[in-house]
Amino acid sequence: MSWSAAQYAKFEDERTRPARDLLAQVPDLPAGPAFDLGCGPGNSTELILARFPGSPLTGIDSDDDMLSAARTRLPDLRFERGDLAAWTPPAESALFFANAVFQWLPEHVTLFERLILALAPGGTLAVQMPDNLDEPTHLLMEETAEESAFAPAFAGRTIRRRSLPSPATYVERLASKEVRVDVWHTVYYHQLANANAIVEWVKGTGLRPYLDALPTTQRAGYLAAYAEKIRKAYPAMKNGRVLLRFPRLFIVATRNL
């Protein structure tokens, strides 16, 4: 799946707010390295650096375009290309921070268990994931993909990512006598200029696997059909703007000292 740092950055303030909210719940760190997993263009990495300037910090991402943007943004930091599904976490780490990346990995709970085992005493795993598959933005991606003009491109392929497990699953799998786990949902309501802005937003994330699956000759048609559905699903308010509802799931797991 391809990513575009420039497209992602169009709504950077809105995308960064959940990272700020997540970081606010991270306690003081012990000695040890910190990692921004799925660092993207470095917006979340920048927050971690400001909060924990004394911790050795590395950003990990699988996309070269995102890594290039992150290195430009924070030239003195270390950024590495890595597949989080296969990445081996260093032992005695102080922080694994992940803003909007693990929703793409179906077996992420198992990965969380592995990350927690690599934490130093007092270390924290902090995760935020979009939990928006039941929102019109994502339901309409599937509906548009099922139209006769586009269905052949998606035949036999699963594009829609898997729904997140229940909050109880995370607590039951991750919490123990040695690990405290906090889980919560936050619903953000983003005021955007119009319905086209919603389309531009999801072009940077959720819509990308759908567009990647289509021949280049069909992408404009798919976007036009999708945009028409979005305009109906998100009518303008009295001020002319639209309100994008965006639920997100947060997890903070900290090993006892």
UniProtKB/Swiss-Prot annotation:
Xref: InterPro entries: Methyltransf_25, SAM-dependent_MTases_sf, Trans-aconitate_MeTrfase, Trans_acon_MeTrfase_C
Cystine connections: none
Classification of source organism: Bacteria, Pseudomonadati, Pseudomonadota, Alphaproteobacteria, Hyphomicrobiales
Keywords from the UniProt entry: Cytoplasm, Methyltransferase, S-adenosyl-L-methionine, Transferase
Localization: Cytoplasm
SUPFAM superfamilies linked: S-adenosyl-L-methionine-dependent methyltransferases
EC number: 2.1.1.144
Main location: cytoplasm
Function as written in the Swiss-Prot or TrEMBL entry: Catalyzes the S-adenosylmethionine monomethyl esterification of trans-aconitate.
Any one GO biological process: methylation
Reactions accelerated catalytically: trans-aconitate + S-adenosyl-L-methionine = (E)-3-(methoxycarbonyl)pent-2-enedioate + S-adenosyl-L-homocysteine
Keyword Aminoacyl-tRNA synthetase carried by entry: no
Similarity comment: Belongs to the methyltransferase superfamily. Tam family.
GO molecular function, one term: trans-aconitate 2-methyltransferase activity
Pfam family name, one: Methyltransf_25
Coiled-coil residue windows: none
HAMAP family: Tran_acon_Me_trans
GO cellular component terms given for this protein: cytoplasm
Superkingdom, natural source: Bacteria
Name of this chain's protein: Trans-aconitate 2-methyltransferase
Enzyme class: transferase
